[in-house]
């Protein structure tokens, strides 16, 4: 398809918002920038032993979207409650972690990076695939999120589904050199960015595992938003 058409002209896809949509109207926005040679953060480069750093509150946007789709009057009133405001804000007004990224970039601590635009597990899987590594995610190290926990009952969705499934949060998943962890924590403090170290990259290529609070390990399914579901 697209790759073959570009190949005929000696061109390649370097990124962008590729999707299949139905309907007469759609919007797309592309931003271009520049970075010094060798300083760009890419998905490739994570190494076994690197730390997994996570900004903010992954899963909130998914909960906000689900709340916005509730149809009954009782459910609508619940979604309008102040308790749900952080979830609706995450979906309606996401904020990229630009200040944190600018504060962290000079430290040279990041070996690979991706933003959570399709879902925590799905985007982490893409980073691992590009880097040729796996990752163990520790549930106990992820941020406690009372609004997200409360939403599970109202929505009938599990916390795991909201936290790791499809969600356009625009938080960052970073592979961090263990020797430069302090620099990452300092950048988070300086920029006022919530940050946790939630796991470690492994040599088990493509394998994502969730280490539960009781120490058990189970596969973490790489679920994320499917941009081409509309054509199937």
Give the ranges of each region predicted by the language model.
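Glycine/charged-rich beta-loop-alpha catalytic/anionic-binding loops adjacent to active sites
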Residues: 34-35, 81-87, 155-156
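Short, acidic (Asp/Glu-rich) active-site segment that either coordinates a divalent metal cofactor
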Residues: 26, 41-103
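Glycine-centered structural positions embedded in regular secondary structure
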Residues: 1, 33-35, 64-65, 69, ...
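Short alpha-helix capping/helix-loop boundary micro-motifs
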Residues: 36-40
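Glycine-/charge-enriched secondary-structure boundary and capping motifs
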Residues: 1-14, 18-27, 31-32, 106, ...
